[in-house]
Amino acid sequence: MSKSVHYLFDVDGTLTKPREKMDSSFTMSFLEWIVGKSVFLVSGSDMKKIKQQIPHSIISRCSGISCSMGNELWLGKELKYKNTFEPPKTLIEMLSSFQVKTKSPVLGKAPFIEYRTGMINFTTIGRDSSNEQRLAYYNWDKDHKERVRVLDQIEKTFPDLEAKLGGQISIDIQPKGRNKSQASKWVRKNLSGKIIFFGDKCTPEGNDYDIYVDVKKNGGESYSVKSPLDTLKLLERN
């Protein structure tokens, strides 16, 4: 099949369950599908976490991997670009205050703030929370909207930054415009062909929203999925 189509995939919630390894049956199906295709992974996570979730057999077949909200791009072993970000001390103090004051009944383990290339990731319950704790917090947060309130306050206080919901428990924070749409813009600028994007956090507060909109506005296709199974069903049509 021609590589005039470029497929861009979010990872958590799209190719895998949040922070889990790719399911073996999904891996087999994806390996059959990926043959002859141009595929990019676009994640809020860093490369280390992506490699923990996605098998090498798939990573090695990808045309590129965009990490940390598009702030780092790898083509094979070649680093194409890497952005930097030094968060204001007042932002770190604000996040620490949010963590101390959380009303969440679920409390996991530190770190609460994780520094990544060109961004930081924040969670009130701790990144080393178990899968059970993550799910419990996610269900609680759907009703109480803690993360939405936090990201709204961040953007009001720091107008040059943007904050987006990431995964089940966290918020991705980066300079305005340095979101996942950096990946689709790079592909469009440097490669010819149509772009098709798949992601699960495609509402305005989600970390897939900007790339979802960018692809659709520029002649591509964007799909909002609810699970890896949902993604597989769509791939059967592509």
What are these regions, as identified by a protein language model?
Residues 20-112:
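Active-site phosphate-binding/coordination module
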Residues 2-3, 23, 174-238:
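Mg2+-dependent phosphoryl-transfer enzymes with acidic/Ser/Thr/Gly-rich catalytic loops
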Residues 5-11, 41:
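Short, hydrophobic/glycine-enriched beta-strand segments
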Residues 106-196, 204:
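Conserved acidic, metal-coordinating active-site core of Asp-based
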Residues 11, 69, 198-201:
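Glycine-rich beta-strand-to-loop/alpha-helix junction loops that act as flexible
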